[in-house]
């Protein structure tokens, strides 16, 4: 949830499009880090009171029986790699095994692309205008493009994005009146070659921008809701695939408990890459 982990010093301290958070091999690792890095910070305008950390003292081994989970693998009807979709759709069935009720459903987040691209361009213009102007030869083309996009925006673009984001937020709030958590893929493609800067297409559908392949992630970022990504399987080439779990605001401990239950039921974290064996 925005503010639980105080953001680092930023040119846009009221930014609500992203938040810092931990990474770890297991949910326990992430849980421990959350206990350490969360809390109040007088130097940032978006922060939670120190007392909120008491919620992180609950055990990870929570009661998951009867939780209502919505699976939205086709969210926004955006393109997604067939193998990634099949793996994540099969993986969500594991929640049934641990006592959850799973339904196929998703909220209306159709305008998330416009909102995300607008706010991202706005922030790039603030963060990188000096880099692009003073050191153009040291800045890659995607950063130049995103910065220029921000410089060319008008006030009406931000106004539209703000109105659309309000509707997205309300759609999510209403959605969580019916479900406890929302599950969807982490990205639209499996890991790709280090020699490829970004995917140009997904399932034969050409992408418009360098960031489009990450639509499952940034769609959730626009909502401002807490999320956690966990491994859920491997491709035919033994590449990892992830599923993300999303909850309503302030459901962080519940998300960690759900992720922990899934982790214990699947034990994907114990799988080592072929390069290690």
For every predicted segment, state its role.
Residues 55, 80-106, 128-134, 158, ...:
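Acyltransferase
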Residues 100-116, 147-150:
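Short connector loops at secondary-structure junctions
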Residues 210-223:
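Hydrophobic alpha-helical segments in the ANL/AMP-binding
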Residues 61-72, 119-173, 185, 189, ...:
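Short helix-loop capping/hinge segments that flank enzyme active sites or metal/cofactor-binding pockets
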Residues 82-84, 110-123, 193-199:
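Short glycine/threonine-rich loop-to-helix capping motif typified by GTGT followed
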Residues 47-50, 160, 192-213:
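Short, surface-exposed loop/helix-turn segments at secondary-structure junctions
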Residues 78, 190-191:
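Short glycine-rich, flexible loops that bind phosphorylated cofactors or substrates
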Residues 1-70, 75, 89-98, 153, ...:
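Structural helix-boundary/capping segments
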């Amino acid at each position: 949830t925005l503010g639980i982990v105080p953001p680092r010093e930023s040119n846009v301290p009221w930014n609500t499009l992203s938040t810092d958070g931990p990474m770890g091999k297991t949910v326990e690792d992430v849980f421990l880090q959350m206990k350490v890095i969360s809390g109040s910070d007088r130097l940032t305008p978006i922060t939670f009171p120190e007392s909120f950390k008491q919620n992180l003292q609950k055990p990870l081994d929570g009661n998951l029986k009867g939780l209502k989970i919505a699976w939205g693998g086709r969210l926004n009807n955006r393109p997604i790699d067939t193998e990634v979709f099949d793996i994540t759709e099969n993986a969500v069935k594991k929640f049934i095994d641990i006592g959850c009720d799973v339904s196929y459903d998703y909220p209306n987040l159709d305008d998330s692309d416009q909102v995300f691209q607008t706010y991202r361009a706005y922030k790039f213009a603030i963060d990188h205008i000096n880099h692009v102007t003073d050191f153009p030869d040291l800045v890659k083309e995607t950063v130049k493009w995103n910065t220029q996009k921000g410089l060319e925006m008008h006030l009406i673009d931000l106004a539209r994005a703000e109105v659309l984001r309000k509707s997205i937020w309300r759609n999510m709030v209403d959605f969580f009146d019916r479900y406890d958590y929302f599950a969807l893929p982490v990205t639209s493609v499996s890991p790709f070659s280090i020699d490829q800067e970004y995917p140009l297409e997904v399932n034969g559908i050409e992408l418009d921008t360098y960031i489009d392949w990450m639509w499952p992630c940034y769609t959730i970022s626009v909502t401002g809701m807490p999320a956690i990504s966990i491994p859920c399987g491997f491709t035919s080439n033994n590449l990892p695939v992830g599923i993300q779990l999303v909850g309503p605001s302030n459901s962080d401990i519940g998300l960690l408990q759900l992720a922990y239950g899934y982790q214990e039921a699947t034990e994907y974290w114990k799988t080592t890459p072929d390069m290690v064996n």
